[in-house]
Amino acid sequence: VEDRRALLRGGRRYVMAYGCARAWATLTFTGASAGAIGGPAGGAAGGAAVAAAIPWSFDTHFTFDLAYIVVSILLVLLFRRFIPLNENRMMKFVSFGCMLAASIAVVLAPWVPEASFSLMVGGSLAAGVGYGLFLLLAAEVLCSFSLLRIFLFLSGAMLLGVVITFFCQGMGVWQASAALVALPVLASLYLHGAYERIPAAERPKRGVPKFSYPWKLFVLYGLYAFAYGMRANQLAWGAGRHSSLSTFILMAVLFLTAYFASRRFNIGLLYRSPVVLMVCGFLLVPAQSLLGAAASSYLIAISYSLMSFLVMLLLYDISRRLGVAIVVFMAIKNAEQLFQVVGGEVPGLLAQAGLPAATQDFVVTIIVSVLILAATVLLFSEKELGNIREDGNALTEQDYYTE
């Protein structure tokens, strides 16, 4: 028991920081009820006021994604000038300032209907920049831990994000407004505290050794992002990649399994799970009339969340083993949000082609299932992509703790 508890030492501040940031992103621009201040308890009028002032065809999630992708691409190109990010005051200030400004814009929008469109668009752009930088700052902190702790802290933070989101969505307008302002403040303070407690020898270095990018891994993740994007706007309630019920279910299973069975934890099995879940999810799409949309939606959302989690774990491991700044790897992964955005346009294009709904579902199912299955089999046959040992066995505790 003491050994298990020791695994969690040193991660409380990171978990709080990332959990608050994920909840904030979901409550502002990335969640299903984003921008509706106060939620069901008291914010319906506020959310309606914002919606009435914004053209029905405009989605601030798009402008959030746009800013998020652009700032990620910029960091991919210029990361050598700024790393380590946590030593760069300008980066930390821009991240915190943009997140706080976005919160203020969301809070003010219902009270200033004539300016709500500008506030929400500007706020979404600021949120994308701030959150994109925050994730890279947080990645530098997390990369200082052992692989097993990275697994536990990352899943624990995502769990916390869902819990915070759940409670905030039930608040009244004033409480929710205060929460939206407080969350980025807390996230930034906790992250600063987490970085300050990292020993100097384990902090990210300024130099960048020669390295090659794991392009095949990024291609695989891009395919999953594209596949998820095609169904992202049609998922049932509670399914989604951000702080949702499907995320809670997945992260609870991962955290508890790693915590209570760390010595027998088989990551190789996890590597093979996303393709099974994704294909099953898309095969259930045509059968929604019989099984309901929930089964398909949850399988698709859990699959994409699991793949995203595993890709991050692989990138952290590659960064630690090769001494490469995690910022560049995570920035590329974040920029691949572009594939989800593009995938989201496919259903509309198929509808414009005049195909019946059943035919559209069938076409999407066949194409995505074949692509995902072929790509996964091909790419994960490459031994350099991960930590799966050549004998095929699970990673041992020694593998996890190797510094």
Stretches found by the model and what they are:
Residues 1-72, 216, 220-240:
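Helix-loop boundary and gating motifs at the non-cytosolic
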Residues 59-82, 249-258:
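Central cavity-lining transmembrane alpha-helices of secondary-active solute carriers
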Residues 96-113, 276-290:
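C-terminal ends and interior cores of transmembrane alpha-helices
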Residues 116-136, 292-309:
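Hydrophobic core of transmembrane alpha-helices in multi-pass small-molecule transporters
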Residues 131-145, 307-322:
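Intracellular juxtamembrane helix-capping segments at the cytosolic ends
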Residues 191-220:
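Flexible interhelical linker loops that connect adjacent transmembrane helices
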Residues 324-352:
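A late C-terminal transmembrane helix in Major Facilitator Superfamily
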Residues 375-403:
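Membrane-proximal linker segments that couple transmembrane helices to downstream signaling/catalytic modules
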